[in-house]
């Protein structure tokens, strides 16, 4: 299983993004099912709506209905784990959404992510790149 971060969804949904081609190649070679979270989808909506407009955000929101994307809902317990993790890690400016993603990944035993911002690697996960 691969976890998908906002940085990947934003690159995939924005043809003007410098990593759009890389995102398309990764998506073409993805496993049968990937995972993301409701927090990541919310962040993706905001990012694409601001950068690319409403139509791009609506297209990205359709991800939640896809049969190849499993959306994990972040529980109060996972949010608390994220807050506790953030308090312990001041070596980088991690976002709360990333910290909730890390909590989901630890809960599900996921090590690999489609992510482009370096935060997942810095947190000990593997940011997958095309071969």
UniProtKB/Swiss-Prot annotation:
GO MF, one example: magnesium ion binding
Residues annotated for Mg(2+) binding in this entry: 5, 98
Top-rank EC class of the record's enzyme: hydrolase
UniProt similarity note: Belongs to the PINc/VapC protein family.
Record-annotated membrane-spanning stretches: none
Keyword set includes Metal-binding: yes
Pfam family, one: PIN
Domain PINc: 2-130
Species this chain originates from: Mycobacterium tuberculosis (strain ATCC 25618 / H37Rv)
Example GO BP: rRNA catabolic process
EC number: 3.1.-.-
Regulation: Inhibited by EDTA.
Phenotype upon changing residue 5 to A: Loss of 23S rRNA cleavage
Function field: Toxic component of a type II toxin-antitoxin (TA) system. An endoribonuclease that cleaves both E.coli and M.smegmatis 23S rRNA between G2661 and A2662 in the sarcin-ricin loop (SRL, E.coli 23S rRNA numbering). The SRL sequence is highly conserved and is implicated in GTP hydrolysis by EF-Tu and EF-G. Acts on purified ribosomes but not on isolated RNA in E.coli, nor on a shortened artificial substrate. Upon expression in E.coli inhibits cell growth, colony formation and translation.
Cofactor: Mg(2+)
Keywords for the protein's UniProt record, in alphabetical order: Endonuclease, Hydrolase, Magnesium, Metal-binding, Nuclease, Toxin-antitoxin system
Protein name: 23S rRNA-specific endonuclease VapC20
């Amino acid at each position: 299983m691969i976890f998908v971060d906002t940085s990947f969804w934003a690159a995939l949904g924005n043809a003007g993004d410098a990593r759009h081609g890389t995102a398309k190649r990764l998506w073409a070679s993805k496993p049968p099912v990937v995972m993301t979270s409701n927090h990541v989808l919310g962040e993706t909506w905001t990012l694409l709506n601001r950068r690319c407009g409403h139509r791009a955000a609506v297209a990205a929101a359709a991800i939640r209905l896809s049969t190849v994307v499993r959306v994990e809902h972040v529980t109060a317990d996972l949010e608390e784990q994220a807050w506790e993790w953030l308090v312990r890690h001041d070596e980088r400016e991690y976002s709360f959404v990333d910290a909730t993603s890390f909590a989901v990944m630890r809960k599900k035993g996921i090590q690999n992510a489609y992510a482009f911002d370096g935060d997942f690697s810095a947190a000990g996960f593997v940011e997958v790149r095309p071969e």
